[in-house]
Design a protein with these regions (language model features):
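Outer-membrane beta-barrel "beta-signal"
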Residues: 257-278, 447-467
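Residues on the lipid-exposed face of transmembrane beta-strands in outer-membrane beta-barrel proteins
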Residues: 94, 124-130, 170-176, 189-193, ...
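Repeated loop/turn-to-beta-strand initiation elements of outer-membrane beta-barrel proteins
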Residues: 102, 135-137, 227, 231-235, ...
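Residues that define the transmembrane beta-barrel architecture of outer-membrane proteins
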Residues: 88, 118-124, 162-168, 183, ...
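Outer-envelope beta-barrel architecture signal
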Residues: 86-92, 141-147, 181-187, 231-235, ...
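Surface-exposed strand-loop-strand hairpins of Gram-negative outer-membrane beta-barrel proteins
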Residues: 101-123, 161-162, 304-327
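Transmembrane beta-strands of outer-membrane beta-barrel pores
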Residues: 96-102, 130, 151-157, 191-199, ...
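Gram-negative (and chloroplast) outer-membrane scaffold detector with strong preference
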Residues: 142-195, 329, 334-410, 427-429, ...
Length: 467
């Protein structure tokens, strides 16, 4: 852009050069220089504003071109806008998580080899993630969603009795609220497996009533503040809750629960300065086609069972029992992020209504669970089948869907009566199939069984959202 200087200023400058004796006083010259300097700053600012405006106009032209040809550059089916350098922003983060351990069982309360309560833990995390670029269609729909995988090392200060587990997990986070372009409130969940525990052993670790297996599931959820320090670095601080358990696949299964703080630093490899500014143009979001889809899930797992005896105590069954089932759920797709529906749930639980004889008989089992000398009897299959109805709700995000359900068995005997609750994570494999990892509770407190399986979605009209 050319800078226009008035003719009278040019004449004054020329006269000062040609006729020094008639030049302006030093004070007047200083004032003129100050005005020229301010004018140059104004011109530079104007040039910068014009460049930003041109960039916004170019983005708008790309979107208008997409509307005319039914192909949206940031929100359509086939193309990606040429001005976007990469589809995602790639990130690497580190976190420190000091935690408080809930004293949920006697072992953690102090009934252990050292006769000291286990009250704290510390975890160090290394995480890779990728997120949608700001001011894209996916960013607007899903609230700046990011996802990835992480590796964590956790110590409880008692390696001999509890171990120092390593955890591998997937995670996803979403913006809850944005206070300004650099500061936001986010939530994040983690789900994975942890290995390296020291489980219960009747001979070598008999006090440990919290953990019964070397490998346990890992669940974590928390909220935090994200502050963008610069183009490359983000600082995070917040709190979270963590649960470790084996999903009732082995006894004991009291689990370990912790809560505490999370503090970390995130490096953004390919974030641009423009990603930290508020855009004047917002991408167009196509109207969501409301419809009914149908989810069919087939699952299976195994479980241990605690059986009450005549003394009123509960003892562990001598082995594991198979579990298999299905869910068929018509789901009403309300918008990009919510589904509601009703599910028909069938299950075969090989541990249902298992009982022991009142008398003690010869039974050779050495599992360290107090089951020696008792015979566990399995009833007929009619006592191990159930059919129920549950209400379902789903929170839909890129790559992952969180499913919750509340239902009751309309057909079932004994142990299979009553309310049940379902919590599941669906991981997209293709547009019409997904992995299903879930858990079933009874009456909001009693652990039931894992639900590991494969799902299929029919009549899926969910729009393809480009990133």
């Amino acid at each position: 852009m050319r800078v226009k200087i008035p003719r009278w200023e040019i004449a004054v400058i020329c006269s000062a050069l040609l006729f020094p004796g008639t030049s302006l006083s030093a004070q007047e010259v200083g004032q003129e220089e100050k005005e020229v300097k301010e004018m140059r700053q104004d011109v530079e600012q104007l040039q910068q504003d014009v460049r930003q405006l041109r960039e916004e106009v170019r983005r708008l032209q790309e979107e208008i071109h997409g509307f005319r040809h039914n192909s949206f550059p940031q929100c359509g089916a086939d193309t990606v806008a040429p001005y976007v350098p990469h589809h995602f922003i790639h990130r690497l983060g580190i976190e420190a998580r000091p935690q408080y351990v809930f004293p949920t069982n006697p072992f953690l309360q102090g009934e252990n080899e050292r006769w000291k309560p286990i009250q704290s833990s510390f975890a160090a995390h290394l995480k890779y993630s990728f997120k949608f670029r700001p001011n894209t269609c996916a960013d607007r729909i899903y609230g700046g969603a990011y996802q990835g995988f992480g590796l964590a090392f956790t110590t409880f200060g008692d390696k001999k009795q509890l171990g120092d587990p390593m955890t591998f997990y997937v995670f996803q986070g979403v913006r809850i609220a944005r206070f300004n372009p650099r500061l936001s409130l986010n939530y994040e969940w983690n789900f994975g497996i942890s290995a390296g525990w020291k489980p219960y052993d009747n001979d070598y670790n008999s006090y440990n009533g919290a953990v019964g297996s070397r490998v346990n599931a890992y669940l974590n959820a928390g909220i935090y503040l994200n502050w963008s320090l610069s183009r490359y670095f983000d600082f995070i601080i917040g709190g979270d809750f963590t649960h470790f358990s084996n999903g009732n696949t082995k006894f004991p299964n009291a689990g370990v629960n912790t809560t505490g703080a999370k503090i970390g630093l995130v490096y953004n490899f390919n974030r641009e300065e423009s990603d930290l500014t508020k855009s004047l143009v917002k991408p167009y979001i196509p109207r969501f086609p409301r419809h009914i889809s149908y989810d069919l899930v087939l699952f299976g797992s195994w479980r241990r069972k605690g059986v009450y005896v005549e003394s009123g105590k509960q003892i562990a069954s001598p082995g594991s029992y198979p579990v298999a089932g299905f869910n068929f759920a018509p789901m009403y797709n309300l918008n990009y992020k919510l589904r509601f529906g009703v599910s028909l749930d069938g299950v075969y639980d090989g541990s249902a209504n298992v009982y022991t004889e009142d008398r003690i008989v010869e039974y050779d089992y050495d599992g360290g669970s107090g089951t020696s000398g008792r015979r566990f009897l399995v009833p007929g299959i009619q006592h191990q089948l159930a059919l129920g109805l549950s209400g379902r709700a789903e929170y839909v995000m890129p790559f992952f869907t969180i499913n919750v359900g509340l239902g009751t068995n309309v057909l079932g005997r004994g142990d299979l009566r009553g309310l049940y609750q379902v919590f599941a994570l669906k991981i997209n494999v293709t547009r019409s199939s997904f992995l299903h990892i879930g858990y079933n509770l009874q009456d909001f407190q009693t652990p039931n069984y894992l639900m590991l399986g494969l799902g299929f979605r029919f009549n899926n009209k969910y729009p393809k959202v480009r990133h």
